[in-house]
Amino acid sequence: MVKPEPKIELGKDLINILDEKGINPTAFLWFYLPDGNTWRLVMSSPSLDKDIKKAYEDFIKEFGKEVSVKAIGLSNISIVPGDNNLLRLLKTAIKTGRGSIGGVRFTSNIVNGVLIEDAYIYRLV
């Protein structure tokens, strides 16, 4: 089975939109899920941390019609709290600047004994 590529440009479009709307994610990345051979767009922001379920519902209402969100697919987007285990693990290995929209491919790395098969990181503060 061929591993798909993350939708890098669509993710970049979406993080720009979120920044413009004042969401300012502190974590925004594609994470590869090998069991399903799919990518998940993972994001976190202090403004979304209080109630993740409500944050996701609000996200759908405000951004669900955005072209980038439709192309990515809502089922491929996860909003997680800032203290999420995956984010904490990744932050031990890599961080980007606050407000930056980088492009760091993080492939086949072991962090604290955990294999990170693939990730594409725009922002991780």
Where on the chain are the PLM-derived regions?
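N-terminal presequence-like segments and adjacent domain-start helices
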Residues: M1-L10
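Short, non-transmembrane alpha-helical segments in secretory-pathway proteins
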Residues: L10-I17
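Short secondary-structure junctions
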Residues: I17-T26, V67-A71
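Short edge beta-strands and adjacent turn/loop segments
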Residues: G22-W39
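Short, flexible beta-strand-to-coil junctions
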Residues: F31-P34, P46-S47, V125
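A short interface-forming secondary-structure element
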Residues: V42-K54
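Short, non-transmembrane amphipathic alpha-helical segments
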Residues: D51-I72
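Catalytic "initiation/cleavage/transfer" segments centered on a nucleophilic residue
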Residues: K61, A71-V125
